[in-house]
Amino acid sequence: MKQSYQIFTAALLASVSLAAAAQARTVSDEQMLDALQAVQAQRSTAMQRYAGGRLQTIWNPQVKHSNVDWWLRSFGEWESYGDDAVSGKSRSVAAGMDMNTGKETRTGIYGMYNHTELNGGTAEALQQDWRIGAYMGKQHGAVQQYGYVNYGKLGNHYNLAEVDMDYKYRGQIVELGGEYKYDLRHDDGKTYHVSPYVNVQASRYMQKSYSQPFPGAPNDLVAVAVNNNYLAGETGVELRRELQNGNYAVRLGYKRVFAGEAPLLVYTMEGVGETQRYSYDIDKDYLHLTLGGTLKLTKNLSATAEGAWLEGEHDRELKADVKLNWAF
């Protein structure tokens, strides 16, 4: 019986290419997709974009806001990893409200849903990401700063058509982050602003161990629990111009992932002592270009649009979003 289990393990190795030497860039496209799905929610900057974008609108002197405001925002994202070995697309929508909690402080809450699809080789994956969170921002003189925190539940679906594998599993995420920005021309009274900035993003992803039937094997395939800590930061400069009915801005920054970009995935077959391990090292260094602006539509309604390009050595992302703000 033990020999049979070893045969099934060998079949598993052949089917999904679980290489014994888990070196970066040597994994199969299917493995790469599996590893990317594990860190996808942590890499997302949606929460940062929602909180920071909302507060930037509030701090725009040309856009009206009141003690309590509501906002609605959606964005799309297109991704490529491993020199196009894996591609993906995301759609997200979020809604929230905020209020004045001090002379210079604004505090809000929000909820978000994000839908991500990834494709690589003969595999495809789907991730559904639900979040609730809060944010707080303060503008004092030339300084603008904010922080945010959120909690989310993830529904993951991985399908490998080659061997008829169709797995579903869940995870949880806790994230926090923030940004500090200083306007070098705050006291000039000019419509042009030059602002160096630095931001940080940290999160923990928690996925319990789960087991699924494996085609042709008498026992289940077991995925060991994943607990991954992720940390990234970015620094750069923002050029912004204020207009009579809004503003527009350009950002150029350098992003660095310090930890958690390559969680280790471990699989085993029930009844067999051997385990199979692999990970995929996503790029750690990126150039980040962002273009955006806000336009006042009516007395109480404004719209914000933004596009961004994130470029690494092997991986890249393209982002676009739009937001509506209501002041009551």
Model-derived features with residue positions:
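Outer-membrane translocation/initiation segment of Type V secreted surface proteins
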Residues: 1-16, 20-87, 169
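Membrane translocator/pore-forming domains, dominated by Gram-negative outer-membrane beta-barrels
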Residues: 27, 66-69, 74-328
